[in-house]
Design a protein with these regions (language model features):
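P-loop NTPase catalytic core
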Residues: 221-222, 228-551, 564
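Short alpha-helix capping/helix-loop boundary micro-motifs
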Residues: 14-18, 50-56, 113-124, 158-162, ...
């Protein structure tokens, strides 16, 4: 028997419900107003009063309206058919909704229950299985989608029977499992899982041991992201956060991409809707949309669903990780999620923290980021969820609570600088403010030594030192004037500019320069570093400036040339000759 209740108070989208039975924390309920039912979540229980946040506009709701509690938390449906879909924060399929605007109380099926899938069994009768063990697989787009023992089945089971190869609907019984007490359990292709609960169906969670290539030079070369790692991109408005995220989503070496548009402008999401079905994935040759799931909760959608959208994205990511896949989850922007938490906290009259954010903001963000990671599955395979979020600090202030809390949880920090954005140095990742703690991991060092070059991390730090010294020299030149400092200061500054223009800047709108493979990055970086380590004899600062400007121009043309093409090799020879003429 479901618990019911009546509306007893309304504070914007927080509704106080007088319940006639037991109600659980985070339980889902439906609030009725007329013929419309709106989904809501219990966020606080005091006696027989349940405080629920409604995921829709509460306009027209009145005291005494009926409320039905469902007896379960907010859940996502996990089944074949998730890829290429566009969802809202509550996993309603946006394509199935009519009209320009989403009507209040709209609910659609997240997957097609009538579609048939070609099933191939992987388990056989007599096998011992546990939660997340693979029973079979179906082909979803080009990904082999594993049919697993549901995550909710926590005991050990014996396979009694598995369906034969053939076409089935997701609701058909795929296997029958017997538990230790002899009871049979039927398993279909579809399962549900609460979004706020991490999927822990794995045997081990080792530290990341390899990097995830993104094709973005300032990330891969200077501050690499690890596969199964966490990172975030803070930056003021207009600094290029969204373009950088789109570039990473197009080029990242991942099997599945989940993009969560959390409180962002709708036109940016529409851009993805239009672009991704047309763009080709360089790793597979298929369209990008075939490996992408978009969870869209734009700024004009209900604020309460923003929190749900990031959890929905992460849960779907954990589901695909359990299939042994590399998943990249990106949220744009987690600041909007934190603002939604602030609104809820204020309406509940909780004690405010800094800037009125909840006192436990740091714990909430840390718990969420901890769900990402590399895991060893029950079958011995590995899967990973890499999480990359953006933060939009008010006024570009990187000391505000959301940035500070995220900094504690994320291992990579890609600070976008307003100064670099204003001078059109894109991507505007500040080379001195940004960092990747993965460079300190011995496992990552070994991987880089083996797959790129021995002592690669030392070369990266050498490049950062050149950039740092160049900035210091530039400060001196600005204070004392061009003639007021030795020519060595100008040389130091221009060497840092060479690294900046050739390695740290990249054209996201050029077909060749947008995606730079690691092999090419290594060759270009070694070449630039070799020049920076050379001694030059310049007569004056103007000669130094002219030489490096010419050199930067040749390198820029090289960046726009096909890798190892005649044009590319031609520029390389020109650069070598140009440098040898000027060397001491």
């Amino acid at each position: 028997m479901k618990t019911t209740g009546r509306v007893n108070g309304i504070i914007s989208n927080i509704v106080i419900v007088k319940a006639d039975g037991p109600v659980g924390q985070n339980e889902i309920c439906y609030v009725w107003t007329g013929d419309t039912k709106m989904m809501a979540e219990v966020i606080k229980v005091i006696g027989d009063a349940a405080y629920v946040q409604v995921f829709d506009s509460t306009r027209g709701l009145k005291i005494g309206d009926r409320v039905e509690f469902e007896g379960h938390m907010l859940e996502v449906t996990l089944a074949p058919g998730l890829l290429s879909r566009n969802y809202d924060g509550l996993q309603n399929d946006l394509e199935k909704m009519d009209g320009l605007f989403i009507a209040r109380g709209s609910i659609t099926d997240p997957v097609d229950y009538d579609a048939e899938w070609e099933f191939s069994p992987l388990a056989k009768a007599g096998d011992k299985v546990t939660a997340a063990s693979w029973l079979g697989e179906v082909k979803e787009q080009w990904v082999m989608h594993k049919i697993m023992v549901p995550f909710t089945m926590t005991d050990s089971y014996t396979v009694k029977s598995v369906a034969e190869a053939g076409k089935y609907k997701i609701t058909d019984t795929m296997a029958v499992l017997t538990d230790a007490e002899g009871r049979d359990h039927e398993v279909t292709m579809v399962q549900k899982w609460p979004v706020k609960q991490a999927v822990c169906c794995y045997t081990e969670k080792p530290r990341p041991s390899r990097i995830m290539e993104t094709g973005v030079r300032p990330i891969d070369t200077f501050n690499p992201m690890a596969e199964g790692g966490t990172g975030f991109i803070p930056g003021p408005f207009g600094a290029g956060k969204t373009v950088l995220q789109h570039a990473i989503s197009k080029q990242a070496d991942a099997d599945v991409i989940i993009m969560v548009a959390c409180g962002e402008r709708a036109n940016e999401v529409v851009e993805i809707f239009k672009e991704f079905p047309e763009l080709i994935d360089p790793h597979t040759g298929h369209t990008l949309m075939e490996r992408t799931i978009i969870i869209c909760n734009t700024s004009n959608m209900p604020v309460a669903a923003r929190e749900a959208s990031v959890y929905t994205g992460m849960t779907i990511g954990e589901y695909y990780r359990s299939m042994g896949l590399k998943v990249l989850v990106m949220a744009d922007s987690t600041s909007r999620w934190a603002q939604a938490l602030r609104e809820m906290s204020n309406r509940l009259e909780e004690l405010p923290g800094q800037d009125a954010f909840p006192m436990d903001l740091s714990a909430i963000i840390s718990n969420f980021y901890s769900r990402a990671g590399l895991v060893k599955l029950v079958g011995g395979q590995t899967g990973s969820v890499t999480f990359l979020g953006t933060v939009s600090p008010a006024g570009g202030n990187l000391k505000e609570p959301v940035t500070e809390s995220t900094k504690k949880a994320a291992r990579c920090f890609y600070a976008l600088s307003q100064g670099r954005a204003d001078s059109k140095r894109y991507p505007a990742i500040d080379p001195l403010e940004s960092y990747s703690k993965y460079l300190e991991y011995p496992e990552i060092r070994e991987y880089l030594d083996e797959h790129i070059e021995k002592d690669w991390v030392d070369l990266v730090y050498a490049g950062k030192t050149i950039v740092q010294r160049g900035k210091e020299a530039n400060d001196q030149i600005n204070i004392l004037g061009d003639d007021g400092v030795p020519v060595e200061y100008h040389e130091r500054f221009w060497k840092s500019e060479l690294i900046d223009f050739v390695i740290l800047q990249q054209d996201a709108f050029d077909d060749i320069d947008a995606n730079c493979p690691m092999e090419r990055q290594q060759m270009m970086y070694k070449m630039v570093l070799g020049i920076c380590n050379q001694e030059f004899a310049f007569a004056d600062f103007e000669a130094c400036s002219q030489f490096f400007k010419g050199l930067i121009n040749l390198f820029r043309q090289m960046n726009y040339s096909e890798w190892k093409s005649e044009k590319f090799e031609g520029y390389r020879k020109q650069i070598e000759q140009y440098v040898s003429e000027q060397s001491k």
